[in-house]
Amino acid sequence: LIYVIIAYGITYVMGLLMWYGYGKGLDLSAFPNAQMLYPAAGVMMAYLITKKGDKNLPTAFYIFFVALTAVLVVCTAASVLAPQNRDLMSMPYSQWAPIMEYVIIGGSVIFWILLLQSGKEKRRSYGLNSEHWNISIRMILLFIGLYLLRFVIACALSGQLSEFGKIMANPTTWIIFFTVLVNFFLSVVAFFGEEYGWRYYLQPLLQKKFGLKGGVILLGCVWAVWHLPIDFFYYTTPDMGLAALASQFVTCISLGIFMAYTYMKTQNIWVPIIIHFLNNNMVVVFSGTYSADVLQNQQIHWGDIPVALVMNLLIFGWVIFLKPFKEKKA
C-alpha cells in the first residue's frame, strides 16, 4: 500500500501540476526526471516502516534516497508553481532545470558512496548486489544488438536507411555514445529508481500471484499506466495522449518481457538498470539529433502502433518462450 501511494499517488498528483504547467506553456522537463525515482522510493519507504528491526536493512542508503526523491518533488513542483522561465530558442526553458540536474548528479555521487558503504551483506539482503557479470554483460550486449536491429528495420521501413548509415559513419555519434555511457554514473538514481521498484520489488510479487509469464505481462501494463501523465503532457501533446499511451503499452510489455528475462537469468538488478538507461539514451545518439529534445513532443499516431507492436514483440518479446519462463512458478 505504501508502495502504491508513493509510486502512483505522487505520480498522479504531479500529473495535475503537469496539466496546469502545460496550460501555462511552462517547461515540464523536470517531471519525467523526478518521476523515475518514485517506484524505488515507495519500496524503501515501505521497508523502512515495516522492517525497522532488520539489521541488514541498508537504512542510511534508503533514507538518503527517499530524501533525494522528496527534494526532486519539491523542485519539480516549484518549476510550475514558481517558474523562473526564460525563452531559449523560442522554447520555454526553466531555470529549475539546471538545479534539477545538479541535484541528480550530486545525488548519484552520494548514492554510489552510500551503496558501497552499506556492505556486501546488506546489498545482498535487499537485491542491491551485482553478481554474475559474465552472463550479465552478454545480456546487455544482446540488448544493444536487438535495439540496433529494431532501429535498422524502422529506418528501412521508412526509407531512411542511407540516413542511418551516415549517422553510424559519423565520428560524433560514437563520441557522444561513449560520453553517454560515462553519464550513467552521474544519472544512475533515475534508472535505479524505476528498476528497483518494478523489477526487484513488483515483478516477483506479480509472478507469484499470476505466474511467470502472466506476472510479467501484467507488470508491463501497470508500468505503462504509470507513464500516463508524461504521455499526455511531455512525450506528446494531449490530443495524441491516448495514442502515446497505447504505444507505451507496446513498449512496456515487450521491453518489460526482455528486462524480466535478463533479471531472472542474472539475478542482478544492475542489468535491467543499465538496459533501461541504454534504451532511454541510445535514441538520443542514434537518431542523429544528439539531443534529449527528441523525446519531447513526439508525433505518435494510431497507424504507427500495429507495426510497433509486431516489431517490438518479435525483437524483444520472443524471450518469453525461453527456459526461465518455463520453470515452476516463482
Where does each model-flagged region fall?
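Aromatic-anchored segments of alpha-helical transmembrane domains
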Residues: Y8-L16, L68-V80, I144-V152, C221-P229, ...
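Alpha-helical transmembrane segments in multi-pass membrane proteins
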Residues: L16-S118, I137-L141, F164-V182, W302-M311
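Membrane-interface capping segments at transmembrane-helix boundaries
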Residues: L48-K55, L116-R123, G317-A330
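N-terminal membrane topogenic signal
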Residues: L1-A7
